[in-house]
Amino acid sequence: VKADFCNPLYAYTKIENELQWEKYRYLFQMHLNLKLIEQHLRLGRIYDKNAAYFYDAPWKDEYLRNLEKAKTCYEAGYIYWQEASLWAEKANVGKFKFLFLTGIQNWEDERERINSGTLDYKKTLDRELKRLNKVIDDLKSMETKSY
C-alpha cells in the first residue's frame, strides 16, 4: 500500500504535531494490513470446506479446485501479517511510549495486542491452513467410487 497520505486535516483523529502524525501513519498502515488479513480470511471461507465426507467423492475435483483458491487466500494473509507486525513495531518505539491518539483508540488497542502477542493472525492462518491441508489430503485419498 504505497499511496501518499492526505493532509493531517483529514485524519480520523485530531493531529496537533508531527510526532502525532508519524504515529498516526504507522497505526493507519498497521490497521489497514489487519483489515486486509480479515478480508482474505473471509474470501477464503467462501471456497473453504470444513471437512471431507465420504459422500463428497463424486465432486472431489470441484472441491479441490475451491480448496486451492481458499489456500491461496489464506497464504496471502501471511504477507499482510508481516506488514502489520512491522508497522505495529514502528508505532511502538520509545518516542511514542506516552503518546496516545485517543481518537483512534481501537488502533492503539490493536497495536498493543500485537505487541503483547494476544493478537496473532499467524496462529490463525497456521490453524486454518493445517485444517485445510487435512481436508485436501482426505479428498485426494478418496476414490470416486467410494460413494
Predicted regions: what is each one?
Residues D56-K60:
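Charged, low-complexity interaction regions
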Residues Y63, E68-Y147:
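C-terminal amphipathic alpha-helix
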Residues A3, E22-Y55, F96-G117, K123-R131:
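Amphipathic alpha-helical repeat scaffolds of TPR domains
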Residues H31-L34, E38, D61-L64, E68-K71:
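Soluble non-cytosolic domains of exported or imported proteins
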Residues V1-Q20, N66, C73-A76, W81:
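Helix-turn-helix repeat elements of alpha-solenoid scaffolds
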